[in-house]
């Protein structure tokens, strides 16, 4: 299947091992278009200290009025079965957050593995395709590939007014989605399969495509 035909669920979480997930955001994309999105804050597992409030840009008192992330079980189980792949920027972090709450999804498609994968990883893809960049942070990639204006446009449409900046869950998920969608305009990648993109997301020589085939920059 061509990757553009796949339904991709782009996810971002804000939180830590200590606090648990304090905010989630996801964007479902298909044929380079956003088909749905959702975001919400979550009641943390532990009281946020001032440093964490500053880091997340969230107030503990306000967060305490929200449901815990564990109450979102059905949402994420259903999301997993509704998409062909999950996607995140540094997907191991998002996968570990999910596993903190639910080690594996209890709902699966026929022949789907008992895991939260497969994952596209925008950080790994860009490391493999553009190895000379050096900085693969989400904000740097958005700036490097002139996605700032489109990100602001999408954020104004989908994000709450107070959560339209980096390190806000839906904002970052939208940024990752743009990094995937821009490949539709690159002929060498636009025609590739979903399996190719999954291999480009992998780390390690045995799992990765030949870098000579991948490197574009």
Residue locations for each model-derived region?
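Metal-dependent phosphoesterase core characteristic of DEDDh/y 3'-5' exonuclease domains
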Residues: 4-8, 18-24, 28-58, 81-217
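Metal-dependent phosphoesterase signature
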Residues: 53-80
